[in-house]
């Protein structure tokens, strides 16, 4: 509808009925000039009683709430008189100011109260009971809310998602609006998460020429960033030009000219390699080339160790009461003589035994060995299986945000290396090229590196296919374990996992041992069954408590996606109660007792241990915890991440999601006592053999498939391995003189 056709209302906010702090959506009562109340819905971040506004929109009829005014645009004016200012502040407009404090401030400064709050906070300290620190805190809160409100109103006026404004303010602070006006394309940057289409629409409406170099260059960089999120280290130049041209409706020739400009300016790194005209983002080019050089150097290094490997093996077998298989002995021999070794194999093939053996051998030789894994859960599992502390790669390298907060830096690096003689890295298939390069750069020149993983599992979420490329290069000493040891091969989880990996169809009707299939043809029936399994059947019949059960799904979307499953599981496992405070955030409710997962790395968040004996910073993507408190007054929640206690403001809840159910990708690197795998319809890109295989291998004692056999068979038959543009394999072979 044309803006000129919109109706206009004006008045003063009487009350706020509902507000969504994630996206600014608000339902409020507006008192018009005649004193009549009107229900208005729209985007009004931090709306509070007492402020005046003019809203443009139309009347709509809600099926439940009746007639209300839906605002498309708004002009908001802060109150200017002392009574209105008091009403505004007393209504909770500014965090930390309630009715009593509002009365003190307004009585002191009258009509100038808001000016003092914004520009002269030191004057607030003249009031008894308000310290200088609190005065500054109140002023900061007021300025922040004013800034977010202006930014969100600007974004909403162009019909864009309000959440983008929230992210922008969190990232850029008070400069966000000015930066956005100067360059609308920052909306499409990785840290803001807007689509290029949204940024482009804003730019074009602001008058930017469709063929401008700024627009085309922004689209090119967006394509590279977008494809790095799909696992690519580079994009062939011709493909980059074609994709960008299609994205913004220009000719490929116009794009190619600007690619050349970006190459000349250093914003794109170009190289002809692997038969491709490869265009890289600079950070990915540097990571790939540097990682290849370090690995190649390590491959050329051998140790003329005088230790007798046969004596070492005999001593280890005697002390550990074990007899190593031939391939496990080969692992020990290679680890003794080479600087870098790869160990791969499926479930039950003895990878853990081999890790313990290598660790024991290094200990016997007086070597200091560090254990690490990509995720907190994988590191914890490594600790439990070896008896030695393991840490995440991020924690090992002491990751943190740089001074600008724009990117991550690692304290441990080439200029401040790790203190060790060897590193054993588990779940290597999850490691992308950026993280692998960071780890390699931090290794001491003589340190050994043992890379362990299952090459048939899903590749990393981030760019590259590092573990596979290293193995396929043929230049790194590699042992592939094939003999099944676990439970003497009696585990149906293990046997069926290997069948799935070979493309064979297990007999899903054979419900016995540790592998079961509950056939459900309707998604609603599957959801009901999964909920029942978690709440009663497994706890009561198999004595497996809900905290030891993990529900997995290939997808987030749909009835059998994690979002819907978590909604049902929360209602069943942690329903509302008087002693469980909760916070609505968007479409999600966070409640005391909820199982939650960190979904992005936060290097700065502070945590302490339960006993208060130690503290640190950093909660990382994939960490699982339980909400222990929800503080509505101070607007924060506390999460216990397996003994590490961290606090979150309500504005940081974007970093959390419920975790009774999670995607198979998120579960990679973890092992659970019992896994329930929900099989329903989803994108063919997700319903693949490697997704199925990865899901099955997450279960330690029990796996239950819930769904229909046809879906399972389709996944096994869908051997669809996504092609990733990466040149690590080729670089390794060239540097080692093979090509």
Residue ranges of model-derived segments:
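Loop/turn positions that initiate beta-strands
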Residues: 50-52, 593, 622
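C-terminal accessory regions
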Residues: 502, 610, 621-739
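Pre-Walker A segment
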Residues: 272-347, 353
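Accessory, non-ATPase domains that flank or precede helicase/AAA+ motor cores in DNA-metabolism machines
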Residues: 1-308, 739
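A generic structural signal for residues embedded in beta-strands
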Residues: 16, 55, 598, 627-630, ...
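Conserved helicase motor core of P-loop NTPases
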Residues: 455-617, 628, 735
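ASCE P-loop NTPase helicase motor core
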Residues: 234, 329-332, 338-511
């Amino acid at each position: 509808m044309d803006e000129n056709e919109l109706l206009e209302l004006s008045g003063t906010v009487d009350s706020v009925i509902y507000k969504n702090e994630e996206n600014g959506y608000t339902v409020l009562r507006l008192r018009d000039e005649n004193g009549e109340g009107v229900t208005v819905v729209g985007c009004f971040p931090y709306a509070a009683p007492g402020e005046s506004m003019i809203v443009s929109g139309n009347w709509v009829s809600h099926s439940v709430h009746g007639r209300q005014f839906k605002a498309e645009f708004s002009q908001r004016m802060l109150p200017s008189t002392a009574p209105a200012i008091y009403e505004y502040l007393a209504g909770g407009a500014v965090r930390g100011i309630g009715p009593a404090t509002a009365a003190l401030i307004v009585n002191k400064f009258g009509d100038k109260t808001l000016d003092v709050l914004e520009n002269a906070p030191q004057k607030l300290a003249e009031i008894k009971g308000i310290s200088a620190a609190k005065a500054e805190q109140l002023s900061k809160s007021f300025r922040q809310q004013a800034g977010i409100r202006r930014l969100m109103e600007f974004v909403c006026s162009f019909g864009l998602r309000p959440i983008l404004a929230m992210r922008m303010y969190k990232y850029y602070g008070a400069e966000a609006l000015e930066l956005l006006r100067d360059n609308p394309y920052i909306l499409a940057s990785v840290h803001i998460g807007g689509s290029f289409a949204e940024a482009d629409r804003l730019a074009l409406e602001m008058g930017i020429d469709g063929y401008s170099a700024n627009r085309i260059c922004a689209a090119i960089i967006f394509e590279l960033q977008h494809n790095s999120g799909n696992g690519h280290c580079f994009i062939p130049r011709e493909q980059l030009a074609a994709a960008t041209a299609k994205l913004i409706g220009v000719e490929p020739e116009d794009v190619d000219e600007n690619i050349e400009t970006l190459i000349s300016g250093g914003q794109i790194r170009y190289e002809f390699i692997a038969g491709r005209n490869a265009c890289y983002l600079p950070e990915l080019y540097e990571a790939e080339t540097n990682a290849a050089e370090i690995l190649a150097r390590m491959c050329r290094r051998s140790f003329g160790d005088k230790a007798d490997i046969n004596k070492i093996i005999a001593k280890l077998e005697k002390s550990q009461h074990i007899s190593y298989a031939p391939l496990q002995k080969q692992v020990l021999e290679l680890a003794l003589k080479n600087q870098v070794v790869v160990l791969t194999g499926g479930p039950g093939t003895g990878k853990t035994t081999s890790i313990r053996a290598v660790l024991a051998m290094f200990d016997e030789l007086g070597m200091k060995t560090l254990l690490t894994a990509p995720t907190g859960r994988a590191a914890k599992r490594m600790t439990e299986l070896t008896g030695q502390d393991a840490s995440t790669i991020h924690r090992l390298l002491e990751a943190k945000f740089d001074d600008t907060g724009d990117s991550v830096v690692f304290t441990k690096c080439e200029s401040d290396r790790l203190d060790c003689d060897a590193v054993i890295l588990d779940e290597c298939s999850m490691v992308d090229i950026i993280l692998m390069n960071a780890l390699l750069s931090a290794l001491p020149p003589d340190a050994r590196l043992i890379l362990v993983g299952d090459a048939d599992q899903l590749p990393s979420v981030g760019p590259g296919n590092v573990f596979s490329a290293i193995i396929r290069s043929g230049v790194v000493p590699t042992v592939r374990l094939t003999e099944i040891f676990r439970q003497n091969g009696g585990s149906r989880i293990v046997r069926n996992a290997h069948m799935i990996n070979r493309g064979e169809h297990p007999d899903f009707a054979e419900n016995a041992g540790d592998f079961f299939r509950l056939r459900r043809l309707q998604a609603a029936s599957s959801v009901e069954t999964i909920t029942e399994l978690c709440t009663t059947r497994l706890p009561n019949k198999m004595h497996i408590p809900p905290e030891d059960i993990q529900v997995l799904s290939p997808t987030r979307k749909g009835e059998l996606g994690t979002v819907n499953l978590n909604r049902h599981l929360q209602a069943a496992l942690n329903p509302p109660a008087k002693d469980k405070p909760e916070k609505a955030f968007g479409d999600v409710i966070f409640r005391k007792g909820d199982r939650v997962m960190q979904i992005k790395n936060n290097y700065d968040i502070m945590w302490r241990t339960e006993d208060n004996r130690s503290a640190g910073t950093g909660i990382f993507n994939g960490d699982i915890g339980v909400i222990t408190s929800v503080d509505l007054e101070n607007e924060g929640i506390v999460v216990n991440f397996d003994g590490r206690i961290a606090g979150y403001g309500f504005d940081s809840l974007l970093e959390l999601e419920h975790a009774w159910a999670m995607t198979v990708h998120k579960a990679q690197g973890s092992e659970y006592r019992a896994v329930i795998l929900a099989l329903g319809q989803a994108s063919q890109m997700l319903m693949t053999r490697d997704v199925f295989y990865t899901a099955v291998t997450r279960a330690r004692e029990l796996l239950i498939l819930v769904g229909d056999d046809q879906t399972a068979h389709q996944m096994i038959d869908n051997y669809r391995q996504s092609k990733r543009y990466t040149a690590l394999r080729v670089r390794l072979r060239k540097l080692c003189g093979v090509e």
